[in-house]
């Protein structure tokens, strides 16, 4: 619990309507998408950068833990207050789009802006912000930067880090820094903005983001390839991507995911398929679209594709992407709890990774539906637990073997979900002692009292 003097300070600073210690608010901010619960000591909603600075300065002086929070949509516990402390939420007030500069193709936003809302606003100006995580309708841009969120457009357009031009960040001691510039080129000084991206709130609190925008492509079209064997689908991915065609998206669902989506939504997916690939291309003329789809179909069929369907209208387009976006919730038919992680490997290693997952599934007796962003090698593996109390420990062992498989294939523990709490103990699998010490020293230099989001990322 917070001492009375701390409670009074925060109430005086932001007002009683923006600081809470009652159980209702603490319960509302004690969990994220992992469904784990850790009760904070208080919840505060700063109105501006100055208040963030004063909050952090005070907390640093009094050694009070601060957990920055966007929408709480993360899958790794990054926004959980595991040892009490103060949840600093940006969703209530810091949700404004400050500027959309159509001449320079940049935008300035506050960290609480919802990703999908931002996309909609820039599209009104025929502009395009590509990063589109599955949580786009809930997640904040500040959270996206803190996790380096990806999405389905990553195959062609990259991920959040590719669009962050500059940040304003409040450090643990309350000091405010600028990192990066509005310019396309900037090699003056260290890349501090790059350090803050994917730092999960451990190094500072983001108060403003400058993002790069693109001109919106006028045309797009999607298609689905059907494969009897998942290995064929994975081979088709890297061979297509290395052929000169660059699809906007290259997504997959395995057989278990297909069946789950069909059981829940009946979208007409081929339930007996080993896997499907859902792809999208864009361009400025119809001939460009047609050529890309023709090339993709050619490479798919050369690698075992037994059916190729091009979406002919908006409804078919929406149905394809609805199926992919709702795969995560659909697989709940296989168990009461899922261990959901997002390992990433080089694209050519996808067949080997999925083979290892199949072996681990058989070894432990778990259903492990997989889907994800194969265009950038990012696979969402989901270990389904029918009896969480009985199976949790065994499930963690199975997931550790999946992590080991990804690392052995020169991959990584996480492509976009981050490390947070759920993967913190596995960091030594991916990094040696010297590398982990470097991370800890960076953390200590910027947050010597360890008040910002402690225990995350294995730090």
Where do the PLM segments sit?
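N-terminal accessory segments
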Residues: 1-32, 61-64, 299-317, 408-409, ...
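N-terminal flexible segment immediately upstream of the FAD-binding catalytic core
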Residues: 1-57, 73-105, 134, 255-266, ...
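C-terminal substrate-recognition/cap domain of FAD-linked oxidoreductases
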Residues: 20-29, 215, 226-229, 234-398, ...
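Glycine-rich tight-turn/loop motif centered on a GG-T
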Residues: 38-45, 87, 106, 336-344, ...
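Conserved, mostly hydrophobic/aromatic
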Residues: 59, 381, 447
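FAD-binding subdomain of flavoenzyme oxidoreductases
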Residues: 96-251, 452
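Activity-critical C-terminal alpha-helical subdomain
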Residues: 175, 424-459
